[in-house]
Amino acid sequence: MYARLFLLLLALFSLSAKAQSIQESVAFAIIGEPKYAAGFSHFDYVNPQAPKGGTLTLAAIGTFDNFNRYALRGNPAVRTEALYDPLFTTSDDEPGSYYPLIAERARYAGDYSWMEIALNPRARFHDGTPITARDVAFTFNKFMTEGVPQFRLFYKGTTVKAIA
């Protein structure tokens, strides 16, 4: 999901058109305005007092031979999208709005021809290693060179560059 959302955003912002105004925000919306203000603590449909912890067991029919759901070959394990966090996440109670998860904020052209993303300094990989701009650029470029063909076709002409 992380890579998919990241790439969706890049595709939206890679259109070659004249730049209009420059927007800077924590959240952004493709349709209208984001529902939640900067610094919101939880989505309205989430119970922040819900018990935390425990074990979740999910069943799946079939087999898998890959944890990389974007690989050209093989059968990925069910729910592998839960292994990856996106730069931005969506809310379930509004369409087309994106809120930072690994990202901290975004700066972008009003016509979505480019986007600059600041990463959350607290963002970490599962092993505790900080996520860097180089990691994001590496992931995108890996998809462009070794990912599924649809990815390369969809994001043709899109570039990602780590600037910090």
Residues of each region from the PLM?
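Bacterial N-terminal signal peptides
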Residues: 5-14
